[in-house]
Curated annotation (Swiss-Prot):
<dbReference type="Pfam" id="PF05690">
    <property type="entry name" value="ThiG"/>
</dbReference>
<dbReference type="InterPro" id="IPR013785">
    <property type="entry name" value="Aldolase_TIM"/>
</dbReference>
<feature type="active site" description="Schiff-base intermediate with DXP">
    <location>
        <position position="98"/>
    </location>
</feature>
<comment type="subunit">
    <text>Homotetramer. Forms heterodimers with either ThiH or ThiS.</text>
</comment>
<keyword id="KW-0704">Schiff base</keyword>
<comment type="function">
    <text>Catalyzes the rearrangement of 1-deoxy-D-xylulose 5-phosphate (DXP) to produce the thiazole phosphate moiety of thiamine. Sulfur is provided by the thiocarboxylate moiety of the carrier protein ThiS. In vitro, sulfur can be provided by H(2)S.</text>
</comment>
<dbReference type="GO" id="GO:0005737">
    <property type="term" value="C:cytoplasm"/>
</dbReference>
<dbReference type="InterPro" id="IPR033983">
    <property type="entry name" value="Thiazole_synthase_ThiG"/>
</dbReference>
<dbReference type="GO" id="GO:1990107">
    <property type="term" value="F:thiazole synthase activity"/>
</dbReference>
<feature type="binding site">
    <location>
        <begin position="207"/>
        <end position="208"/>
    </location>
    <ligand>
        <name>1-deoxy-D-xylulose 5-phosphate</name>
    </ligand>
</feature>
<dbReference type="InterPro" id="IPR008867">
    <property type="entry name" value="ThiG"/>
</dbReference>
<protein>
    <recommendedName>
        <fullName>Thiazole synthase</fullName>
        <ecNumber>2.8.1.10</ecNumber>
    </recommendedName>
</protein>
<comment type="similarity">
    <text>Belongs to the ThiG family.</text>
</comment>
<feature type="binding site">
    <location>
        <position position="159"/>
    </location>
    <ligand>
        <name>1-deoxy-D-xylulose 5-phosphate</name>
    </ligand>
</feature>
<keyword id="KW-0963">Cytoplasm</keyword>
<feature type="binding site">
    <location>
        <begin position="185"/>
        <end position="186"/>
    </location>
    <ligand>
        <name>1-deoxy-D-xylulose 5-phosphate</name>
    </ligand>
</feature>
<comment type="pathway">
    <text>Cofactor biosynthesis; thiamine diphosphate biosynthesis.</text>
</comment>
Length: 257
């Protein structure tokens, strides 16, 4: 039986979601997207060049069959984010939206007050909202109560590559909310993706870790394997941690005893 997961009316098999920014060129981006095995790709609505003559649109390079997840990147107020989400829908990018309301330009941490406010409006307008948020369980619960279809807490600041810095809060969020929890931002390498999945995340979203790797296509393959391995480890169940050793072989029936 396939190990699928769902957000709203959408069901997926791959638990890796990828972005489209920071690649050296469109060809590399396209090859990496294919190598990742991802079914969902996020695109910044405000950065789309849909009508620039003489130049191919970013959307033309996204492999056919991938689900578009428009995002409200670079929005610093709830009002900006709401307008941007509406623009994405006008461009026929669907009901899904990765909601970002940034509160600080240096850290790119979210403005959680504005985020919750924007989420409430967009949910009422029929959007399937996936909010990028901090790793605070209280905020995650407020977003769930606002009607968000999932919550996407950061593992570390966007593009930092620092990995999963606060696994304890992420676990509390997963225990607190009933909607899917996707780890978004901060992943640097495949082991970070595996850790996120081992904690119980439904999926992981990343961009910089693949796009700025020395070999983006190979890193996309590594991230795919990391997510799949972490998911299998979570389902299998790790052994309890212990302070002292526990012999693998029986201590009875030894030679000479």
């Amino acid at each position: 039986m396939a190990d699928t997961w769902s957000i709203g009316a959408h069901t997926f098999t791959s638990r890796l979601l990828v972005g489209t920014g920071k690649y050296p060129d469109f060809t590399t981006m396209q090859r990496a997207l294919v190598a990742s095995g991802a079914e969902v790709v996020t695109v910044a609505v405000r950065r789309l060049e849909l009508s620039k003559s003489g130049e191919a649109s970013l959307l033309e390079w996204i492999p056919k069959g991938m689900k578009l997840l428009p995002n409200t990147a670079a929005c610093f107020t709830a009002e900006e984010a709401i307008r941007t989400a509406r623009l994405g829908r006008e461009l026929e990018m669907g009901d899904l939206v990765k909601l970002e309301v940034i509160g600080d330009r240096r850290t790119l941490f979210p403005d959680v007050e504005g985020l919750v406010a924007a989420a409430k409006v967009l949910v009422k307008e029929g959007f399937t909202v996936l909010p990028y948020t901090n790793d605070d369980p209280v905020t995650a619960k407020k977003l769930e109560d606002a009607g968000c279809a999932a919550v996407m807490p950061l593992g570390a600041p966007i593009g930092s590559g620092l990995g999963i810095r606060n696994p304890y809060n992420l676990r509390i969020i997963m225990e607190t909310v009933k909607v899917p929890v996707l780890v978004d931002a901060g992943v640097g390498t495949a082991s970070d993706a595996a850790v996120a999945m081992e904690l119980g995340a439904v999926a992981v979203l990343m961009n910089t870790a693949i796009a700025e790797a020395r070999d983006p296509v190979l890193m996309a393959e590594a991230m795919r394997a990391g997510v799949e391995g972490g998911r299998k480890a979570y389902l299998a169940g790790r052994i309890p941690t212990k302070l002292h050793a526990s012999a693998s072989s029986p201590m009875t029936g030894l030679i000479g005893t």
